[in-house]
């Protein structure tokens, strides 16, 4: 079956460490607009921002992008994009849903396209990205999620686990998980219907819910890591990069 993708970008107004970060100005534009523009450059599907606040919706539409307002009480971006999908596409035209985080203003079109590639294997439920860790301090940083997987090729893994700990043990490279997901529609439907799993709650990583329910996640390895914006320090770094 041919892949018919749609890109959904979740963006909520609330953020504990950096309030209203989706609207933070970077090089003359709000952060969420930078993400939408990069997604548009990937040029393979419809792009919609899914938000919980009218202020974000107004900004997104003012820049010519499509937006939908969702409920405010979603616990994850996956839940938010699923609600958006049910409103946008009741006819089920789209069979692949690409979840591009709204706080990745330095993401590239190449990385977005790469996230789809593992779905070329019909056995893969969910595809995501990773990159080799090159900074020594990141190996022990709990904010850097590591991938434990079995190699399928030189640039692809089947994920066995994700962790904030330093793993796997021993000699060899470690890989940084990049939180972009391409779901088969049926996989997203299954995922959001599941209750949070024990390991998900312990590690605070929602992708573990899928693994604990025997869903297959394959990881495409890319060369660069887009900088996520979670703090004011992150925001200042991104402003320098995109200045």
UniProtKB/Swiss-Prot annotation:
Q: What is this protein called?
A: 3-deoxy-manno-octulosonate cytidylyltransferase
The family this protein is said to belong to: Belongs to the KdsB family.
EC annotation?
2.7.7.38
Location(s), subcellular: Cytoplasm
Gene Ontology biological-process entries: CMP-keto-3-deoxy-D-manno-octulosonic acid biosynthetic process; lipopolysaccharide biosynthetic process
The reaction(s) annotated as catalysed by this protein in its Swiss-Prot or TrEMBL entry are: 3-deoxy-alpha-D-manno-oct-2-ulosonate + CTP = CMP-3-deoxy-beta-D-manno-octulosonate + diphosphate
**One annotated GO molecular function:** 3-deoxy-manno-octulosonate cytidylyltransferase activity
Lineage summary: Bacteria, Pseudomonadati, Pseudomonadota, Alphaproteobacteria, Hyphomicrobiales
> CDD domains given for it?
CMP-KDO-Synthetase
Pathway(s) per entry:
Nucleotide-sugar biosynthesis; CMP-3-deoxy-D-manno-octulosonate biosynthesis; CMP-3-deoxy-D-manno-octulosonate from 3-deoxy-D-manno-octulosonate and CTP: step 1/1; Bacterial outer membrane biogenesis; lipopolysaccharide biosynthesis
What Gene Ontology terms describe where this protein resides (cellular component)? cytosol
Tell me the gene name: kdsB
What job does the chain carry out?
Activates KDO (a required 8-carbon sugar) for incorporation into bacterial lipopolysaccharide in Gram-negative bacteria.
Q: Does the keyword Endoplasmic reticulum apply?
A: no
| UniProt entry keywords in alphabetical sequence | Cytoplasm, Lipopolysaccharide biosynthesis, Nucleotidyltransferase, Transferase
